[in-house]
From Swiss-Prot:
Stated name of the protein: Hemocyanin subunit 4
GO cellular component: extracellular region
Job of this protein: Hemocyanins are copper-containing oxygen carriers occurring freely dissolved in the hemolymph of many mollusks and arthropods.
Keyword Nuclease in annotation: no
UniProtKB keywords: Copper, Oxygen transport, Secreted, Transport
Main location: secreted
Length: 23
């Protein structure tokens, strides 16, 4: 659903931020 899509996007963004902040 729409809420699920948002949650997925947020998870992807958080993962990318985690990767960036590691470097």
């Amino acid at each position: 659903g729409f809420g699920e899509d948002i949650a997925m996007k947020q998870h992807q963004v958080n993962s990318l931020l985690d990767i960036l902040f590691v470097f």
